[in-house]
Amino acid sequence: MRVSALLLVTLRDDPAEAEIPSHKLLLRGGYIRRVASGIYAYLPLMWRVLRKVSAIVRQEMDAAGALETLLPQLQPAELWQRSGRWSGYTAGEGIMFHLQDRQDRELGLGPTHEEVITALAADLLRSYRQLPVNLYQIQTKFRDEIRPRFGLMRGREFIMKDAYSFHASAEDLGRGYAAMDQAYRRIFSRCGLQVVAVQADSGAIGGSASQEFMVTAEAGEDLILSSADGSYAANQERAESLPAEPVPLQSATAAELDTPGQTSIDALVEAQGWHASQLVKVILLVARFEQGRQQPLLVSLRGDQQLNEVTLANWLNQQHGQAWGALLGIEPLEAKHLAAEKVPAFGYLGPDLSDAVLQGSKKLESSFLRLADPTALDLPLFICGANRFNAHRLAANWSEPGMASPQRVELRAALPGDRCCHDPSQQLQARRGIEVGHIFQLGLKYSEALGATFANEQGQDAPLWMGCYGIGVSRLAQAAVEQHHDSAGMVWPVPIAPFEVVIVIASSKEAQQVELAEDLYGQLQQAGVDVLLDDRNERAGVKFKDAELIGIPWRLVVGRGAVNGQVELVERCSGEKQEGPHQDLMAQLLQTLDQQRQGL
């Protein structure tokens, strides 16, 4: 490929819309262009990267015995209604684009394909002799993200590989899950990525177990918590830990203290000299359910802890989903929904806040669902808001008159510095990560809902055991840039680089340089190398900057030494340069490329 035919349009300055390095570089390097919020065009360079990533994914999935297929993007609402996910994905903050056709039939534009594949399995899989089977596809998915950001990281349209396996038993599902785990590790390794496998929450997909694969990068949206010995790692949403022991509140007489302007834990600690673990903070939320219920929540946490909203959402679904329908979302309870004259600033609220404050809203239930984390409930004495402006209570306790009894629910989030459960002598360490893969053991969730059964060895009908396995192909490509870049531009790993080598002609006006460059270009093509020839009539400095920006792993510079058959070989990742006879450097380059393609 010649640059003159490539449609290479690079930018010198960072686009205003881009926040993280990989997004800036992909836009500047002419890999992608924004069409609308969360919607991007993949330009020729990017498409070459995506094809290479997809090829590696296909090779490993095929080697693992999976069968490629292609499922419809338009999905009937009826399937999602049978699984119980239609309302959750379309109402409120649901992420599914949905529409009605000419016959007023409801359809969804697939964000995922569990329902469709399970319906097909119900039709196609009749006997244990057909099991196990694993079907996968690489396809564009659609999600109506509330806040699209970071380019391809969180878009409304993206390329994904999703696979679905069906098994005769839980044990066989476990074996299939383990096989996919190993296939995923090979995929990410071959793509040149440093990935951490972590325990994860199953979220809206569901199931009994799941694991995420995280590319470690400072711009990652997820917080990974892990032990120093490497034996434990989890997404913060799923992580478990032992909380720090609280600093005891010395015996004191119950009293109210003036705390003007001290509406946060940090402000109270600084002004009063208290320790955060001596305080109980109150968080007011509203949980919205499928059947229309809007349930106010009063959550009490120890002052040094944070709420894990994923844990809270899971608990609400488990405890109340059957009676109230699926949980649609959890939002902060706004002051405008309360009886304003009875409610102080939220920083002064205590666990005994009266239900009477809810009289200001006709939409909300008339009483709080009161929940408290054990770290708060186990405090014999604590400091909390006095439910009036500029005041806190000292030496409050849960057994005193007027203190409502909340339900005891594990709601705290694991935090960096917490003690590890498996070894309290170790502390959890934090790093940022970008999720590029997620595997699930779904169990019987979808097969039972959609009637997907098979005849087992005893001739009896039994539900299929199911797993699902996703890789964000377009997200993986951007994550590679986030992990491999420098101040000059991208640094693509060889296996997924759009081109492996770029030949730069220092002066297109020099016939000897052009002749040698053309000769090397032909040799590399014959050797099966993905090579790009920069044949533009531009200054050498412009060509060098573009070559570094777009991140081609190797650069051959044909300059003044061409008269003697001399060229310069530059490795993008290290910046190391070598000059010598073109025959010697070409032989060295081909040998090195062969090793790099294999991840060596």
UniProtKB/Swiss-Prot annotation:
It is found in: Cytoplasm. One of its GO terms (cellular component) is cytosol. It is an enzyme of class 6 (ligase). Pfam families: HGTP_anticodon, tRNA-synt_2b. Its EC number is 6.1.1.15. InterPro entries: aa-tRNA-synt_IIb, aa-tRNA-synth_II, aa-tRNA-synth_II/BPL/LPL, Anticodon-bd, Anticodon-bd_dom_sf, Pro-tRNA-ligase_IIa, Pro-tRNA-synth_IIa_bac-type, Pro-tRNA-Synthase_IIa_type1. It comes from the Bacteria. It catalyses: tRNA(Pro) + L-proline + ATP = L-prolyl-tRNA(Pro) + AMP + diphosphate. GO terms for biological process: prolyl-tRNA aminoacylation. NCBIfam families: PRK09194.1, proS_fam_II. Belongs to the class-II aminoacyl-tRNA synthetase family. ProS type 1 subfamily. Consists of three domains: the N-terminal catalytic domain, the editing domain and the C-terminal anticodon-binding domain. Catalyzes the attachment of proline to tRNA(Pro) in a two-step reaction: proline is first activated by ATP to form Pro-AMP and then transferred to the acceptor end of tRNA(Pro). As ProRS can inadvertently accommodate and process non-cognate amino acids such as alanine and cysteine, to avoid such errors it has two additional distinct editing activities against alanine. One activity is designated as 'pretransfer' editing and involves the tRNA(Pro)-independent hydrolysis of activated Ala-AMP. Homodimer. This is Proline--tRNA ligase. It comes from Synechococcus sp. (strain RCC307).
